[in-house]
Amino acid sequence: MKLVFLFFIVAVMVSLFVGMTEADKPRFLTTVCQDTYEKCKEQMLKKDKK
């Protein structure tokens, strides 16, 4: 889970540098958040099955 959290922080940092235009920033952040959320959900489902 630490790796996912670290990836999220890096992605946010990258989004701030890369997506400087206001139109791109929310779209990029939304994609990152959804991607991170899906990964977290998968991890939680795997834990529940054990």
UniProtKB/Swiss-Prot annotation:
Signal peptide: 1-23
Location of the protein in the cell: Secreted
Record-level Gene Ontology MF annotations: toxin activity
Any one GO CC term of the record: extracellular region
Tissue-wise expression: Expressed by the venom apparatus.
Major localization class: secreted
Keywords: Cleavage on pair of basic residues, Disulfide bond, Secreted, Signal, Toxin
Intrachain disulfide bonds: 33-40
Family label: Belongs to the caterpillar 9 family.
Purpose: Probable toxin.
Record-given protein name: U-megalopygitoxin(9)-Mo13
Natural source organism: Megalopyge opercularis
